[in-house]
A protein has these predicted regions:
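Short coil/turn segments at secondary-structure boundaries
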Residues: 69-75, 288, 316, 353-354
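Sequence context surrounding c-type heme c attachment/ligation sites in exported
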Residues: 269-276
Length: 593
């Protein structure tokens, strides 16, 4: 049996180009990894992490479980295309073995097996199974066509605006499986066989189309099928569909603890090109839903970075609230990629940023517990006064790092991309904390909390947000609170909730003093207040617009007081509502017996 026909040529060329480009990209990216990352891969290979990564590939790259959580119909669409095509390949491979044994069959022989196997006795099991899988994939294609017409049916208000290369690949992919159906059915019409789908369509064709036109149709259909595959394969490495072959190594590398950092690295390529541009990140973005800004979302940031088209406006206009990352089905570390892109654009060390604090120490008090207010808390003095009262009520001796002013934690500069200047600030504060011998560091600012935990080297110092610290005091019996009838609603700050995973502690504190009413968007889905220090592009008026939309949802709970656990959120939400907005520490002080 000869496994070649002229129509195979587009497929063969396309597959050769695709695999050559994939090998070049993977090889280059892996080669350029730093030695430490290569060691992580080497030591991670013979561990359980490899098995965990393999399972994640099945559950996410094929079954798309994260997308199912967004919308079941959307999840089914992605699964039918990915898992269905995979099964067509796997079962098709088994089919050739069932017919021919383990003899060598070239790649095109497997792909176009129905064309080459016309003289063989048909096996009903494979005819039925392959038709069932083809129908499975075709159902996904139909849903993809429908999504283009009405995306809301799949829970998406907005879809991605694709570049021309993506449209070429998308068009080719959409026609691959309908073309396969017609080609295989035409062959069945001429030579018999086929399952419930191709066989039935083939019978219809043979009854309505003459032999010569049918032979011409068969040839044209196989050419079209092969050409669609060839075009798709050539376009794939340069389009959004590169994610098919990039998400898999990304999952393994992530399991081996490779991460994106403050500076761009070769590992970033795996993250950037693993983006499928599915558009799931668009709807959660408040810049889009509130302000109508629709060209800076993560999908466009990653696209522009990949093609070296990234503009300052796109890189800087992001709240970095994490709402999009929470929904990303590939789990790309979007904020880290933003930071190192900004670092590349903005990081020019400036002595004026940090020169002023050489030798500066305005701290006061003594004690093993230290309190770092942070810049934003200093702008909301009631929060710091409340913490002072709580420390006094608990009998805590406290060292105050910055009650009379001090040095910023450094995170705002880091988020702006000025990482070298930020590191100077971090070193100063870390030295100050160690100098005064504290063992616990409490802060009321989630921005400070996150940078202390992730970027500071503070061995032997426990770092707590004031919500965690207050709850500890309550449970230890060091604070006696009176539970009242006041109704509160709680706003989850981005850096505290999605950023640091602290959701339960603030709620437990609120429930110790009154009734908690949850807003519509809460916990992982909580809205950003709009005044993020990470966004240097939107105006003050636009920040207020976002704050009003957040406050409206909080007011809708019917609560008497809006509570938050971030000084920046407190100020922002306060500008968007006439309701009373308090910090968590303030309602605790009011309830102390």
């Amino acid at each position: 049996m000869t496994f070649y026909a002229p129509f195979c040529l587009p497929f063969i060329i396309g597959a050769a180009v695709m695999f050559a480009v994939l090998a070049w990209k993977w090889g280059t990216w892996l080669y350029r990894l730093p030695r430490a990352d290569k060691k992580r891969i080497l030591f991670g290979l013979p561990t359980r992490r490899t098995f965990g990564a393999a399972w994640e590939v099945v559950s996410e790259s094929l079954l798309h479980r994260r997308i199912f959580r967004v919308n079941p119909l959307l999840g089914y669409m992605h699964m039918s295309l990915a898992f269905g095509w995979f099964l067509l390949i796997a079962v098709g491979w088994a089919e050739t073995i069932a017919y021919l044994g383990f003899r060598y069959v070239p790649l095109q022989g497997h792909v176009f097996f129905k064309y080459f196997a016309t003289g063989l006795e048909h096996k009903p099991f494979f005819d039925f199974t392959m038709d069932l899988l083809l129908l499975f994939v075709l159902s996904g294609v139909a849903l993809a066509w429908g999504k283009r017409l009405y995306s809301r049916a799949m829970g998406m208000r907005r879809t991605t605006k694709h570049v021309p290369g993506d449209r070429v690949a998308l068009s080719a992919l959409w026609f691959v499986f309908p073309a396969r159906l017609v080609a295989e059915s035409a062959t069945c019409a001429l030579y018999g066989g086929g399952g419930f789908l191709t066989g039935s369509l083939g019978e219809w064709m043979s009854g309505h189309i003459g032999v010569m036109p049918l032979m011409n149709l068969e040839t044209a259909a196989w050419w079209f099928y092969s050409s669609c595959l060839g075009v798709f394969f050539v376009a794939l490495p340069f389009s959004r569909y590169m994610h098919i072959f990039t998400e898999i190594p990304l999952i393994f590398l992530r399991r081996y603890n490779l991460r994106s950092g403050e500076k761009e690295s070769s590992y970033d390529n795996f993250q950037v090109e693993a983006c499928s541009r599915c558009g799931i990140c668009i709807d959660p973005c408040q810049l889009q839903s509130v302000l109508g800004v629709d060209d800076v979302q993560s999908v466009y940031f990653l696209r522009d970075r990949r093609y070296n088209m990234l503009r300052l406006q796109t890189a800087d206009n992001c709240l970095m609230c994490g709402r999009c990352a929470e929904k990303c089905p590939v789990d790309i570390d979007l904020n880290s990629l933003r930071v190192n892109s900004r670092d590349k654009m903005h990081n020019v060390p400036d002595e004026r940023r940090y020169g002023y604090f050489k030798g500066l120490d305005r701290s006061e008090g003594a004690g093993k517990v230290g309190y770092f207010a942070g810049c934003m808390t200093l702008l909301t003095p009631r929060t710091m006064s409340a913490m002072s009262a709580i420390f006094e009520a608990a009998g805590e001796e406290v060292w105050w790092a910055d009650r009379e002013g001090g040095v910023c934690c450094g995170r705002p500069l880091k988020l702006a991309g000025e990482t070298d200047s930020a590191r100077k600030m971090m070193k100063y504060n870390a030295d100050l904390f160690r100098k005064h011998g504290i063992t616990t560091l409490v802060t009321s600012c989630p921005i400070c909390l996150k940078v202390f935990r992730e970027d500071y080297d503070l061995p032997g110092i426990e770092i707590l947000h004031h919500s965690e610290y207050i709850l500890r005091l309550i449970r230890a019996g060091r604070l006696s609170l009176e539970h009242g009838a006041m109704r509160f609603t709680y706003h989850d700050p981005c850096e505290l909730g999605r950023g640091s995973g602290i959701y339960d502690e603030p709620r437990a504190v609120i429930e110790a003093v009154g009734e908690l009413l949850e807003p519509a968007s809460t916990r992982e889905n909580a809205l950003c207040c709009g005044s993020s220090v990470a966004n240097t592009a939107i105006s003050d008026g636009q920040q207020v617009q976002i704050a009003r939309s957040v406050a409206a949802q909080l007011d809708a709970t019917g609560a008497e007081v809006i509570v938050t656990a971030c000084p920046l959120c407190k100020k922002a939400i306060g500008r968007g509502t006439k309701s009373e907005v308090r910090d968590l520490a303030e309602i605790v002080v009011a309830a102390i017996k």
